[in-house]
Amino acid sequence: MKLATGLWVWGSLLMAAGTVQPSASQSVCAGTENKLSSLSDLEQQYRALRKYYENCEVVMGNLEITSIEHNRDLSFLRSIREVTGYVLVALNQFRYLPLENLRIIRGTKLYEDRYALAIFLNYRKDGNFGLQELGLKNLTEILNGGVYVDQNKFLCYADTIHWQDIVRNPWPSNMTLVSTNGSSGCGRCHKSCTGRCWGPTENHCQTLTRTVCAEQCDGRCYGPYVSDCCHRECAGGCSGPKDTDCFACMNFNDSGACVTQCPQTFVYNPTTFQLEHNFNAKYTYGAFCVKKCPHNFVVDSSSCVRACPSSKMEVEENGIKMCKPCTDICPKACDGIGTGSLMSAQTVDSSNIDKFINCTKINGNLIFLVTGIHGDPYNAIDAIDPEKLNVFRTVREITGFLNIQSWPPNMTDFSVFSNLVTIGGRVLYSGLSLLILKQQGITSLQFQSLKEISAGNIYITDNSNLCYYHTINWTTLFSTINQRIVIRDNRRAENCTAEGMVCNHLCSNDGCWGPGPDQCLSCRRFSRGKICIESCNLYDGEFREFENGSICVECDSQCEKMEDGLLTCHGPGPDNCTKCSHFKDGPNCVEKCPDGLQGANSFIFKYADQDRECHPCHPNCTQGCNGPTSHDCIYYPWTGHSTLPQHARTPLIAAGVIGGLFILVIMALTFAVYVRRKSIKKKRALRRFLETELVEPLTPSGTAPNQAQLRILKETELKRVKVLGSGAFGTVYKGIWVPEGETVKIPVAIKILNETTGPKANVEFMDEALIMASMDHPHLVRLLGVCLSPTIQLVTQLMPHGCLLDYVHEHKDNIGSQLLLNWCVQIAKGMMYLEERRLVHRDLAARNVLVKSPNHVKITDFGLARLLEGDEKEYNADGGKMPIKWMALECIHYRKFTHQSDVWSYGVTIWELMTFGGKPYDGIPTREIPDLLEKGERLPQPPICTIDVYMVMVKCWMIDADSRPKFKELAAEFSRMARDPQRYLVIQGDDRMKLPSPNDSKFFQNLLDEEDLEDMMDAEEYLVPQAFNIPPPIYTSRTRIDSNRSEIGHSPPPAYTPMSGNQFVYQDGGFATQQGMPMPYRATTSTIPEAPVAQGATAEMFDDSCCNGTLRKPVAPHVQEDSSTQRYSADPTVFAPERNPRGELDEEGYMTPMHDKPKQEYLNPVEENPFVSRRKNGDLQALDNPEYHSASSGPPKAEDEYVNEPLYLNTFANALGSAEYMKNSVLSVPEKAKKAFDNPDYWNHSLPPRSTLQHPDYLQEYSTKYFYKQNGRIRPIVAENPEYLSEFSLKPGTMLPPPPYRHRNTVV
């Protein structure tokens, strides 16, 4: 009670200024309905707002305040007292909303059909400007709708307001006030406000007008006592109990008094029992009663409206524009031929006839010529459809002339003009207003409604079959004595009479327009509407009439139809009925007795007696009655008032209480039975589940089990060396793995989860481990193991050359076409494997492809990858960061990811390679990418790409996902291109392009700077035997080459494998040029017989073996090596390029002569082991076979110019005669060639065991299914990557500066 008293003390200070003023002083302005739309110029937006609402008190419509800057003066809004629609305050930057005098929001129209007051997003994201206070200190009433206050960063005190006191219907669905406003950093209300205020001072306390009222008040109040109730017509509070003390009116304001309705235009006169015109009538205009509607409004009944409804027409009576019901068709004026929109038209034709639909008045002329009726081929106008001429049935007036010189042959009259009343003749055709010429098929005119031809003459000639024209007295149609008639050369009158073409006998002597009683100019006896009849239905018939002269008029609808032989009525109106069909009120028949009709001083209520006559109710009955006494008054419980005596109400109350208790008991029993049945049903379902649980799975999927194994590593086996980078979940270190109980050192990458991350990050971290451990492919990074220390660690193989994006950018001057296309094939094969395993990558890009060696790349970063279930076709992602510029359009719009969306990303990745690390859509804001793609624009064609390569990219960027190629097709397409790379990629100096040395990479050098890798072993070489059930290869011991040796002890023995003509491979996997330079190798399980010693370069040594005819299969004993060496296995990515094939193996393993055959599938390139001992003190690493020490050094030949270049696949112009293996023999290295082998990576090429080489299909199966590689690179934090954008930042309203778009390309 103290709270209420304190508030009312403050509220009393405002009462004097808050009462309703007469409507004459109210300044009314129109509202808007633009919602969040605004003008492009903010200055113009502010000026428009000020122009609308300056000096405005009542807003007839919606008050919308949007997109106003912080420095604008909004003091003009203080004059607004009332809003009939909704109030919208959004997207503004000002601090204070000065609607200090706003009392009531009526909510006749709601924002989003729900809110009468909506205030949101009123702050500037990149600044400190925003709405801080709501100056609504006098707002006390919202009649309809709820309140929405949200996302106002700096707004204070809104959460202290008692909104239930303001909103008339405070349902939970109408109230929204969330914590995104600035409530946490705001001050407290003044102590006199008791916790509810609009601002910090005592002048901003909220005034309560409903929740503090006494129970007896049925509305607002101005104090806590019973005597302080406001009048029931008050809204928003009051200063006293009268209807003139209201702050605002619930319904209408009549000169300062709040009333239920405005004084009506007609009032019931109890003396005459008639509705009479009320001279004190007023019209409803919004919530006000006005004597006269505004000049731009019209009167409809007793209201001011903007336009008449479709069933009424606007007329002016006594200087007042009013809406009157249309007697027939509401008028519509149209332009005639030669006027207005038809100024250039010469006739009515098929191109313009539709413009005359529903026309009642033709402003101009109607002309019918042969080019309109039968068509105009010259102007490509078709003949008119005769049915369309019926549009003229609505025409009542033609202000000009009617010219008919052509008519459809199947129409014998002009009945389409049956409603034509007047031909004005304001424009004449050679002095004529009606012209009908040479219409041979016309038999009658049938202008049955024509009453006047205001000006001009009549010309009707040469109509050989026209009759009835001679019966008409044409002069009765004329308005002046100067008008003439020319009617000749039509059908003779006697011929018409002979054929019975005469007027109906009911027509008078004035004539007729055609046959039948409806064509008479006037009737001989009686008429009903337009039809002449013999007599009226006075005593019989379906409906009864009375005679009004010669016109039969139907009796009033309130007259009861009498028996045959008795009159139903004596005249017009309900007071001339013989008997009433419903009730009789005085002399008038009415549909019901008056019930609440407004009288001169009060409302009229009557009841009907047993004779159905109406009598007045007792004066105490204010809601109607059933009889003459006060005990017969009608009582409505919801009004809160009763005129029944107390003794009459007691039984009703008792019956209501008993009935309510009975209903409550029934509801309680029903609820108990429902709960019991539900419990029993649940127990039965659980019993059935337990019975069948161990019998068979409930939902067998049929999916094969994932038998991938996860290696758990101890923390003591790992040593962290150097930080490589930081990611969203943790940090990546370069490290060393020393397996427990062994002496080998394996370089690895260690990804450690941050200690501050939560459980969700741990789950996502392990999900990534699951996916990486399940993948097994030479071009996918796979997990080596997991260390379950307090901070989870993922251990992967260390990639020595970093990501492909940085690699191509660093070596763009040394990368040729062959290598680019090889990478395209490898990435496609990796993605094809993912598609076979039903895994969607979702983040394929050049930054997520790592380089193990220049010839071998691997796909990594499975942080966004998702496995699909057996029956899933797509994955729908939740919110989060996304690489927008690499994503397909369906991913951006619907977050729907499929294998075909990965194809889109693959196309962007290829574009990055072909531009040597170019940024896609560089300079374009990420938020503009979706619109750009929808308009058809794509990445431009890279300069080095031919149209063949670019079209493959374009196919990857098709909007329809099903139209994009599959990864299998992409792998095959780029394999075909890789066989002839210079045909598809045009790179200047491609023939002389030198592949960068594996050790030249900056990333690789940084890895080697801090750790001695002398004893390092690659992770794959350590782990592969555990993944293959194939015999381990046998190796010879490795020694150093004596650089002073110049002779060869033995020539290399021959061995065979399918090879290209431009290189050969030793049996250990090494490569050599035509000059015979040895390459890194690994031994196979077979030995080869010795060959004769060759002189000079090693190429000469091979000449003998090449030309000795058929070579034989080598046989030699095995040599055992240590266990660490036996872990090494064949690299799955070894392949033999197919340019210039020399031959193929026969059944015994020998090479057959070369012959034409189809090109083999493009296989994976040879891969080096990046971690071997480096050269020290200028010494060259020795080949393992000591017999190479006898090689002699001869003078270099002219073709030795390539000897110092890296030897990779498909990079040589010359071809070697044949390919041979070398075993147990030594090649000498010429002095000039020593430096070609400074890079230790060149000494470590490997091939699979011989059994694998003899079966290429077997090799391909293993390389696809079992080999896997690991990587230690982690993707950077998503928020730091500018190519990622969150879902929220793509919403409308996100403001980003639009940099110039330098390269655009459009796909048609």
Curated annotation (Swiss-Prot):
Binding site for ATP: 724-732, 751, 797-799, 843-848
Reaction(s) the record says it catalyses: L-tyrosyl-[protein] + ATP = O-phospho-L-tyrosyl-[protein] + ADP + H(+)
Signal peptide from the UniProt entry: 1-25
Lineage, top ranks: Eukaryota, Metazoa, Chordata, Craniata, Vertebrata
Motif (PDZ-binding) on chain: 1290-1292
Locus of motif Nuclear localization signal: 676-684
GO function term, MF aspect, one: epidermal growth factor receptor activity
Record protein name field: Receptor tyrosine-protein kinase erbB-4
Ranges where the Protein kinase domain occurs: 718-985
Organism in which the protein naturally occurs: Mus musculus
Enzyme class: transferase
Extracellular side of membrane: 26-652
Record-listed E.C. numbers: 2.7.10.1
